[in-house]
Design a protein with these regions (language model features):
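Sequence/fold signature of self-assembling virion shell proteins
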Residues: 2-18, 23-25, 30-33, 53, ...
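Assembly/oligomerization interface modules of large self-assembling protein complexes
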Residues: 21-84
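Short, flexible loop/turn elements at secondary-structure junctions
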Residues: 54, 92-94, 172-176, 273
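Extended, low-charge hydrophobic alpha-helical regions
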Residues: 78-98
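Short, solvent-exposed loop/turn segments at the edges of secondary structure
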Residues: 81-85, 165, 264
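Alpha-helical scaffold segments that mediate packing/assembly in large oligomeric complexes
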Residues: 91-162, 289-297
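Extended, solvent-exposed, turn-rich assembly/linker loops in the middle of proteins
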Residues: 128-207
Length: 297
């Protein structure tokens, strides 16, 4: 008996399309947010000046002997903002063939993600630029190295006081965290710079219930990023105080949608942000070098 199947009725079948998926980027900002951030107001210059006063020295005195005065000379660092942007262009005919409102929202999300990644990659060069280094290329990251960074910053020529030590942050790659996690939460064997005592049950439950750092190490939170500067299989992570660097946001994200060229019958969608960044105090940060080869066990 003749039968009709889906193989015969092809022109009446509706095409089924799900919601578009977005290509993900590591667009969180643990690096940028770790530095001192200044945001300009309307009417301000695109160059930010950050002056600094020197310290003075107290001396013992002898009765009846005049003490000598000191000359105060200030210093300054300046950061000039430059534009960073991303743009895409669509024909109006193409937009008419799709759900254009949803498409434009997705494009806005993708462009915002791209700007965040660019910020992170830029400020990662500040971490790579610290003059003092903990860790070693080709070797796994250790808790001892983080502890060394904390100690060096506390004893720096311009030392961080106890309150400032509480503002430190460390940023490492997922591979570096893999090595650190095995030291922070040991199974009972192997060398570790962390105490080998078993963590309380509630701490273990909270720690192992989610991926990544869940707290801090002696007051220093550990963040993960894949936007750190790399050199082969090695990565330039870091531990630093916010005042080690300055991020100046002259103009926040400005998004526009406009006719690119009427004769092209197209629409341009763009996003621009204006910022600058620079090192403020090299002694307030430590570059953390370590092997970041993807682990297999």
């Amino acid at each position: 008996m003749p039968i009709t199947t889906t193989a015969q009725i092809t022109n009446l079948q509706e095409k089924v399309i799900g919601a578009a998926r977005l290509t993900l980027k590591d667009d969180q900002q643990p690096i940028t947010q770790g530095f001192h951030i200044e945001r300009a107001n309307a009417g301000q210059d695109d160059t930010f000046n950050w002056p600094k006063l020197p310290g003075v020295t107290a001396f013992g005195l002898s009765e009846g002997v005049d003490m000598s005065s000191e000359t105060i000379v200030d210093s300054n660092m300046s950061v000039s903002a430059t534009e960073v942007g991303v743009a895409v262009e669509f024909t109006r005919k193409m937009l008419r063939t799709i759900n254009s409102a949803r498409f434009m929202r997705n494009m806005g999300s993708a462009m915002g993600s791209a700007v965040n990644v660019k910020k992170e990659q830029d400020t990662a060069t500040l971490v790579d630029g610290f003059g003092n280094v903990i860790g070693l290329d080709g070797s796994p990251a250790t808790i001892g190295q983080l502890s060394a960074g904390q100690t060096q910053l506390r004893a720096n020529t311009e030392p961080l006081n106890s309150a400032m030590i509480g503002q430190l942050r460390a940023v490492v790659t997922p591979a570096m965290w893999h090595d650190l996690a095995q030291m922070l939460f040991p199974t009972g064997s192997g060398d570790s710079h962390a105490p080998m005592t078993a963590p309380p049950a509630e701490v273990a439950s909270r720690t192992f219930s989610r991926y990544g750092p869940t707290g801090n190490y002696f007051g220093t939170p550990i963040f993960l990023s894949t936007n750190l500067v790399a050199s082969g299989n090695n990565t330039r992570g870091g531990v630093w105080h916010p005042d080690a660097g300055l991020f100046y946001e002259f103009m926040p994200i400005d998004m526009y949608t406009d006719d690119s060229d009427k004769s092209l019958r197209s629409l341009e969608m763009g996003m621009v942000v204006d910022y600058g960044f620079g090192e403020a105090n090299d002694g307030f940060g430590r570059e953390w070098d370590a092997d970041s080869t993807s682990p297999t066990s």
